[in-house]
Structures are given as structure tokens and as C-alpha cells.
From Swiss-Prot:
The modification Phosphoserine is found at S107, S185, S455. PANTHER family: GLUCOSE-6-PHOSPHATE ISOMERASE (PTHR11469:SF1). The modification N6-acetyllysine is found at K12, K142, K454. In the cytoplasm, catalyzes the conversion of glucose-6-phosphate to fructose-6-phosphate, the second step in glycolysis, and the reverse reaction during gluconeogenesis. Besides it's role as a glycolytic enzyme, also acts as a secreted cytokine: acts as an angiogenic factor (AMF) that stimulates endothelial cell motility. Acts as a neurotrophic factor, neuroleukin, for spinal and sensory neurons. It is secreted by lectin-stimulated T-cells and induces immunoglobulin secretion. It comes from Oryctolagus cuniculus. This is Glucose-6-phosphate isomerase. The keyword Methyltransferase does not apply. GO terms for cellular component: cytosol; extracellular space.
Length: 558
């Protein structure tokens, strides 16, 4: 594929931006088109609630949207989409298919990889997960002293941690009757020490999530958990009642002491950051029940069908993706804020921080050339209204344009005080996107200060600080209620957005070579930390850091 910057549609878009971009004014766009909301919004109607995507508060016109969609077509988004759904090996650097969509393919239509339909294997693992969940949640599965399981501890990192953690937090209202869940990811001993201190080995079940069963952080934490467990249980044969594996390495799993019958497999066409739909989601299913896990899959499958079959101009993931391209590649925006106004979604931004930045944080194209344009943004965010009292100042009056996605459910899980809390939350959600769009003019600020009785001197002093330029772009994503189905749909929507942007940039969104170099160097440095002899084999900075650590290791602190 030709470089993006040589694409005629992209050049046309850039030319338009150079000539007209600075003239785009959201207040003016709304004033001159009273139907702007209807022209630039999309409602997705499902049998399990509705999702409204309002993108009218973006710096776009109908002409710009046409150019963005023409660009998507010219970059082969539709063909690439079919290649993914058809099981072609679109992960070119690892020669793998990319089929998280198969994991939630509720229609069971065949999906073929290397001449073999993968759906029977997918369904076999789902059936095994279902039976296991029923045994644990019903109390049929007993620990070594005959106690039922009260706590499930997922030990994994990256995609084996972030997805299940985010979803179990988001679906906490649906966890009645399930065990508590804990997540240990960090190699920092504090993480597992703090977790184990809260647990009873007799009623704890550990899920070790590692495809290869060799991931350093995960296996180190798993061995620590096993040692802690055996301090009480004594008998190594009891490990089989308290440890299960999500892996493909039967030999290593067996060597650890886990019964291979309690190993849940997944496949090389499941990328870590897209794996919560697979056996990696076992902690989700245990916590909220398998029926709710299936609803999560169904919501994602609904969005898969929307993404695959809907024309681009009405396609939610495509619209989100191309708006992102507009801001990143024409306006020079470097970050994207994800701001869920729902406390249960407090890990949503962190989840897509990995999903987006590990997927599209690349400067090499599929053909091996270096890009001459920006690619993936820095993704960040916190739940509303907390963020309003932290970083919204910079979004409103800072020098950087930060496109924002605001998300909120219409119905709350907790209508306390007759819904007062949620009404205040909704009001803040609505106010923020309006404020970012409209801002506050000099004249409006002046009238406000005059009404407050400010003297002419104070007025002139405060006036420039009270002005808001506005014209800050936002998407509003409003959904009926945060249910397993709707959550599945929202996650899939963002997954496909990331995919579309990767296609436009001609990068492989499904490898992650950038995480390897640090791991390689860490293996070299680890033995150098032993002993007290100074290290001289690195650059002066790394040598200095290692030697300071060695000096301070035994330092006495008062």
C-alpha cells in the first residue's frame, strides 16, 4: 500500500484543513444548522438497550465527513475488515489470523483458519468454562479441607489481567452469588503480599493466566502463591484443587502441579489485549456467572455484525476511527481522553490505554517502511466527575487540543435518594460537553463579572481568566444501562475503531514487538544485581543506577 501521505484522498483532506481548518467554529456550526445533532449522531438499537453516539460536537462539516469516509475506502478498510472476519492471517509479522471475533461468534457460522473451522474448538472451551463455573459457584467444587471457594485470584499480566479486571469491576452489580475476585499482575512483591494477606488458603482458587506458562511476572507470582498455599496445605497433591491454568503449554502446567483437566486453552489467533472473550475471561464468568458472560459475548457479537455489515457513514467504529484520524493527522492532536461517567467503568480508560497504544503505537508500516505521519494517540482518562476536579482545567483552557469521549448510562445501578446522585452526574456530563463546545466569550464573561458586582479594576484583571475559547471536540456516548450486553458492545466498538485506524495508517495493530527489548535487557541486568561489585558493562547512566541500588540495599534507615 502507498504511504498515507501520498494518498490523494488524504492529500485532499490535508489541503482542506490547511485552507479551512482554522475557520471551523462549533458555535457557528450549531447556529447555522439547527438539525446538526440529527445530521451528526447515530443510535444503535439492540434488544438489550440502545447506544447513542453523538458526534455533532466535533470540528467537522458534511464535506469533511465525506472526505474522511472516502479516505477510509481508499485505504481498503472494507476489504481489510472482511479479511479479519474471514480468518486471513492479517497479523503479518507473526503470520497469524486475528480472530477475537470468533470467540464471541454467537451465530456459530463457520470461521476457517488453515482449512479448519475454529468454532467447534471455541464452543468446546466455552462449554468447559460453563461446567467449571457451575461447579465453583454452586459449591460443588471443594478445597482441600472441604470448604467451598469464596475467593478467586487471577494471576496474569497485560491482556491476561487488564480485561478481566476492567470487566469484573464494570459488572460488579451482577456478581451476586459469585466468589470475590482479586487480580495480581505486578512483579512488585507488594502486590501479591497485600493480596495473600486477605485470603484463606482453604477457600481460595488461583487462576494462572499465561499462554506459554513462562511469562516471568506471572510464573514468579504463581510460584509465590503456591508456596504460600503449601504452608497451610502441606501436601503438594492439593494444589490441583486450588490452581487452574489458562494456557497452551500442557507440560509446564502439569509440572507446576495443575491437573491438565483444569487447563483451559486458547489459540495463537487470540491476541492478549483482545483475549477477555476467551478462557482468559474465566474470572469474569466465575464472578458474574456464565449466563452474564454469554451476554457480554452477545453484546460484542452484535457490534461485530454492526461493524461488518453497516455502511461506513452509519458505522459507529468507523466514524470514531476517522474522527480520530482527522484530529491526529490534520490537527496534530497527540492524546485522546476517555471519560466514563460511571464509577463501575473506572478501569475502562486503562483497558483501552493498552488496547490502543499497544496496537497502534508503531512507526513501521506493514511493508517495513518508516511512517512520515503520526500514528496511535496517548490514551488516558478517569471517571467523571473526579476528572473535573483534576485535569479538566487543561482540557478547557490549556494550550493543547484534546479530543474527548464522554460515556454515560441513562439508568443507574444505584438510584439512591430518588436518583439524585445520578441526576447530578447526568447534569455534569451534559454540561461538560456543552462547555467544551461553546466556551464563554469575552462579552459573556464581562456580563457575568458585572452582575457579580466587580469593580472596573477587578473586572479587567479577571476578565481574560474567565474567558473560555471553547471549540474543544467531544463525542458523547450515551447508553440505556451498563449491562453485560451493552458493555460487550462498547468494548467491541472501541476494538474495531482501533483496527480501522491501523488499516488507514497501514500498520500491524496485532503485534507488540516494542515490549520485547526491555524484557531482554532485564534478563541481562537481573544477575548483575547480585553481590556488591560495581558494574561497568553498561552506559554510565545504567551503571550509575545499578551501583547506587547496590550501595543502598543494605543502608540503615532511621
Amino acid at each position: 500500500m502507498a504511504a498515507l501521505t501520498r494518498n490523494p484522498q488524504f492529500q485532499k483532506l490535508q489541503q482542506w484543513h490547511r485552507e479551512h481548518g482554522s475557520e471551523l467554529n462549533l458555535r457557528h456550526l450549531f447556529d447555522t444548522d439547527k438539525e446538526r445533532f440529527n445530521h451528526f449522531s447515530l443510535t444503535l438499537n439492540t434488544n438489550h438497550g440502545h447506544i447513542l453516539l453523538d458526534y455533532s460536537k466535533n470540528l467537522v462539516t458534511e464535506e469533511v465527513m465525506h472526505m474522511l469516509l472516502d479516505l477510509a475506502k481508499s485505504r481498503g478498510v472494507e476489504a481489510a475488515r472482511e479479511s479479519m472476519f474471514n480468518g486471513e492471517k492479517i497479523n503479518s509479522t507473526e503470520d497469524r489470523a486475528v480472530l477475537h471475533v470468533a470467540l464471541r461468534n454467537r451465530s456459530n457460522t463457520p470461521i476457517v483458519v488453515d482449512g479448519k473451522d475454529v468454532m467447534p474448538e471455541v464452543n468446546k472451551v466455552l462449554d468447559k468454562m460453563k461446567a467449571f463455573c457451575q461447579r465453583v459457584r454452586s459449591g460443588d467444587w471443594k478445597g482441600y479441607t472441604g470448604k467451598t471457594i469464596t475467593d478467586v485470584i487471577n494471576i496474569g499480566i497485560g491482556g491476561s489481567d487488564l480485561g478481566p479486571l476492567m470487566v469484573t469491576e464494570a459488572l460488579k452489580p451482577y456478581s451476586s452469588g459469585g466468589p470475590r475476585v482479586w487480580f495480581v499482575s505486578n512483579i512488585d512483591g507488594t502486590h501479591i503480599a497485600k493480596t495473600l494477606a486477605c485470603l484463606n488458603p482453604e477457600s481460595s482458587l488461583f487462576i494462572i493466566a499465561s499462554k506459554t506458562f513462562t511469562t516471568q511476572e506471572t510464573i514468579t507470582n504463581a510460584e509465590t502463591a503456591k508456596d504460600w498455599f503449601l504452608l497451610s496445605a502441606k501436601d503438594p497433591s492439593t494444589v490441583a484443587k486450588h490452581f487452574v491454568a489458562l494456557s497452551t503449554n500442557t507440560a509446564k502446567v502439569k509440572e507446576f502441579g495443575i491437573d491438565p483437566q483444569n487447563m483451559f486453552e486458547f489459540w495463537d489467533w487470540v491476541g492478549g489485549r483482545y483475549s477477555l472473550w476467551s478462557a482468559i475471561g474465566l474470572s469474569i464468568a466465575l464472578h458474574v456467572g456464565f449466563d452474564n458472560f454469554e451476554q457480554l459475548l452477545s453484546g460484542a457479537h452484535w457490534m461485530d455484525q454492526h461493524f461488518r455489515t453497516t455502511p461506513l457513514e452509519k458505522n459507529a467504529p468507523v466514524l470514531l476511527a476517522m474522527l480520530g484520524i482527522w484530529y491526529i493527522n490534520c490537527f496534530g492532536c497527540e492524546t485522546q481522553a476517555v471519560l466514563p461517567y460511571d464509577q463501575y467503568l473506572h478501569r475502562f480508560a486503562a483497558y483501552f490505554q493498552q488496547g490502543d497504544m499497544e496496537s497502534n503505537g508503531k512507526y513501521i508500516t506493514k511493508s517495513g517502511a518508516r511512517v512520515d505521519h503520526q500514528t496511535g494517540p496517548i490514551v488516558w482518562g478517569e471517571p467523571g466527575t473526579n476528572g473535573q476536579h483534576a485535569f479538566y482545567q487543561l482540557i478547557h483552557q490549556g494550550t493543547k487540543m484534546i479530543p474527548c469521549d464522554f460515556l454515560i448510562p441513562v439508568q443507574t445501578q444505584h438510584p439512591i435518594r430518588k436518583g439524585l446522585h445520578h441526576k447530578i452526574l447526568l447534569a455534569n456530563f451534559l454540561a461538560q460537553t456543552e462547555a467544551l463546545m461553546k466556551g464563554k466569550s469575552t462579552e459573556e464573561a464581562r456580563k457575568e463579572l458585572q452582575a457579580a458586582g466587580k469593580s472596573p479594576e477587578d473586572l479587567m484583571k479577571l476578565l481574560p481568566h474567565k474567558v473560555f475559547e471553547g471549540n474543544r471536540p467531544t463525542n458523547s456516548i450515551v447508553f440505556t444501562k451498563l449491562t453485560p450486553f451493552i458493555l460487550g458492545a462498547l468494548i467491541a466498538m472501541y476494538e474495531h475503531k482501533i483496527f480501522v485506524q491501523g488499516v488507514v495508517w497501514d500498520i500491524n495493530s496485532f503485534d507488540q514487538w516494542g515490549v520485547e527489548l526491555g524484557k531482554q535487557l532485564a534478563k541481562k541486568i537481573e544477575p548483575e544485581l547480585d553481590g556488591s561489585s560495581p558494574v561497568t558493562s553498561h552506559d554510565s547512566s545504567t551503571n550509575g543506577l545499578i551501583n547506587f541500588i547496590k550501595q543502598q540495599r543494605e543502608a540503615k534507615i532511621q
